[in-house]
Amino acid sequence: MMGLRKMCRGSLMSKIIIGRYIPGDSLVYKMDPRGKLLITILFIWAIFLANNPITYAIITFFCFLAIIATGLKARVFWNGVKPLIGLIFFTSLLQLFFMTGGHVFWHWWIFSISSYGVENAIYIFIRFTLIILISTVMTVTTMPLEIADAMEWLLKPLKIFKVPVDEIALVISIALRFVPTLFDETLKIMNAQRSRGADFNDGGLIKRAKAIAPILVPLFIHSLETAIDLSTAMESRGYRGSAGRTKYRVLNWSKYDLISLAYFILLVGLLLIFRTH
């Protein structure tokens, strides 16, 4: 029973959806990847425009509208937030105990809880959560190759300065694609070591760190082997850099991109109206 519980804990890693594409046929899937990437970047910028409860409520509402528009289950987006929830809480706690200003509720040594700290802790928590959610909307509805094409288009002006935009876009898309692969391989290694009696869940922080250390070597070796296999496959298919290459899939703007642009303009307009100046 204990072994089954540990396996279930480990299976959480297989549910991480960072970098995973989930097939679908909703409005968001029909958007041009360039439009999705641009809207995602601008949406993250808009999150930082919010500075009071009304504006945070507005941008949260629009974020959930985007999630609903994907047609995917809420569990998908929860799995996107869950791996980083500890980091979000930690960042919020730093704001809570070290941010000063307003009415002080509690104070001890260098720590204090004030009205300004509570407010900022809540805002930081919402802000990071929304950034992860809207980024998840982008990654689960867009194939890695489409993300690469969108990044290449977005970075195209840098070609004037001789920046290798095509290669940068390819590297980023490959990195996104191999995030879930690394998680899956980590899970396999952990399960193999559990079958040999390894325990990754019991003990303090130092003991857990020592238990995880043996995973790093085989994971590093597997990453190198995967990189070599990928480079060999690309070279065998005649890849010599992206310069001069044609596109199999031609990207075209559609009415769905105009709808999303109007959606974003409405969001920014509401934020500018209701934010505290």
From Swiss-Prot:
Q: Name one GO cellular component term.
A: plasma membrane
Q: Which UniProt keywords apply?
A: Cell membrane, Membrane, Transmembrane, Transmembrane helix, Transport
**Subcellular location, record wording:** Cell membrane
Q: Where is the signal peptide?
A: none
Name one molecular function that GO assigns to this entry. transmembrane transporter activity
Q: What is its main location?
A: membrane
Membrane protein topology class: Multi-pass membrane protein
Q: Where are the transmembrane segments?
A: 39-59, 61-81, 85-105, 121-141, 163-183, 254-274
UniProt keyword Transcription, yes or no:
no
Stored InterPro entries? ABC/ECF_trnsptr_transmembrane, EcfT
Q: What exactly does this protein do?
A: Transmembrane (T) component of an energy-coupling factor (ECF) ABC-transporter complex. Unlike classic ABC transporters this ECF transporter provides the energy necessary to transport a number of different substrates.
Fill in the subunit field for this protein: Forms a stable energy-coupling factor (ECF) transporter complex composed of 2 membrane-embedded substrate-binding proteins (S component), 2 ATP-binding proteins (A component) and 2 transmembrane proteins (T component). May be able to interact with more than 1 S component at a time.
What family does this belong to?
A: Belongs to the energy-coupling factor EcfT family.
Mind telling me what this protein is named?
A: Energy-coupling factor transporter transmembrane protein EcfT
What organism is listed for this UniProt entry? Lactobacillus helveticus (strain DPC 4571)
Task: State the organism's lineage.
Answer: Bacteria, Bacillati, Bacillota, Bacilli, Lactobacillales
Q: Which gene encodes it?
A: ecfT
